[in-house]
Design a protein with these regions (language model features):
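Solenoid-repeat scaffolds in large eukaryotic assemblies
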Residues: 3, 19, 200, 220-221
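Extended, helix-rich scaffolding/adaptor regions
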Residues: 1-110, 125
Length: 234
């Protein structure tokens, strides 16, 4: 209860109304749970409800902390997050970036037949695409279901250069170091199974770091616990 009160106080300084709404819903669920306990109700799902309440509280606190630091911190991470994205880049979703990266090898081969200048243009465009993909992924605190699906396409693509995939894995790992996101953790576990050994090992290193950082929170997520139980290597 004290944690919820402190979080409510923190959110008064936060401009995100969605987070406030989530907190209000969480507080309501917590009150109902306490009332059922006072009535002596035998609820077999009580422990699961409690774990979800704690997990949601952590996540709201994470998002609130980031939003407040975005307005105050001089760290490059927060500078990138608070800098408005140019309108010309608004259409560059992860799916769009994937298509651009997939065409790199063909574009490079064609440009090599034309001129060194054309080849330099392709190389520069590829470098800029990677930079934008990295920054966008690193500073994204929570994937939407659509973004998670696009990230899965990165793993299944047969045209994406492995080095580009490895950079994306690093960006996901660094993003998780800034803010917990269950979707990204589950994705890293998928990436660990990638057939390319370099991609798989990079994902494994990321998983180990993330599991250490959030070791006190992992048990709150049943799906994650079940997933890890099936992986003897970790």
């Amino acid at each position: 209860k004290e944690a919820l009160m402190q979080l409510e106080s923190l959110l008064w300084q936060c401009p995100d109304w969605d987070l406030r709404t989530r907190l209000e819903q969480l507080q309501t669920s917590y009150k109902y749970m306490l009332e059922y306990m006072r009535q002596g109700a035998n609820d077999p799902e009580r422990w699961n409800v409690y774990r979800k309440l704690v997990a949601d509280t952590w996540e709201i606190a994470d998002r609130s902390r980031l939003l407040m630091l975005d307005n105050a911190s001089s760290r490059y991470y927060h500078e990138v997050r608070r800098t408005p994205r140019p309108e010309s880049l608004s259409a560059y979703t992860l799916k769009k970036l994937l298509h651009m990266l997939e065409s790199f090898n063909d574009d490079l081969a064609v440009s090599g037949l034309l001129s060194d200048e054309k080849m330099d243009e392709v190389l520069k465009r590829h470098e800029e695409t990677l930079k934008y993909m990295f920054l966008q992924t690193w500073t994204n605190s929570a994937w939407t279901p659509e973004e998670e699906e696009d990230a899965q396409s990165m793993l299944t693509s047969e045209l994406l250069p492995v080095n580009d995939l490895c950079l994306f894995i690093s960006a996901v790992t660094l993003s998780l170091m800034e803010c917990f996101d269950l979707r990204k953790i589950m994705w890293l576990l998928d990436a660990y199974r990638h057939p390319d050994v370099n991609a798989g090992q990079r994902a494994l290193v990321g998983v180990i770091f993330i599991f250490h950082i959030y070791r006190n929170r992992l048990s709150l997520y049943n799906d994650l616990v079940k997933r890890v139980d099936l992986m003897d290597e970790i």
